[in-house]
Amino acid sequence: MREYRVIINRAARVDFLEIRTFLWGVLSFQSAEKYANAMRAEIKSISIFADCFQRSTSKQILSIHPQARRMVSHNKRWVYIFHIEDDFAIVDRILSAKNIKQ
């Protein structure tokens, strides 16, 4: 199994900041930070598990990147969309699982 270096795209950073801002409005500050840290850990885990995920067949996900793969978060609320280039796993977007059409 190969290990990749994870890079977070600008669009994914914006998505993450929007999610974190939303969490601050809904949860207490400590709970929101704990949730955000869990999401960061999941993103870091892509470095190890990137090869385990097959290319997506969803047209919506493929419109983001033609070689896109997806990883669903631990609570199945978020979808991390990424692709692999050379030694890098590049996270393209973080979307709500409810918005992904099959």
Tell where the protein language model's regions lie, with residue ranges.
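Arg/Lys-rich, positively charged N-terminal/basic patches that mediate binding to nucleic acids
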Residues: 1-42
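Residue-level signal for well-ordered alpha-helical positions
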Residues: 19, 49, 94-95
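A generic structural signal for secondary-structure junctions
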Residues: 24, 51, 96-99
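A short, surface-exposed loop/turn module that caps and links secondary-structure elements
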Residues: 44-73
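Enriched for short, Lys/Arg-rich terminal
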Residues: 72-102
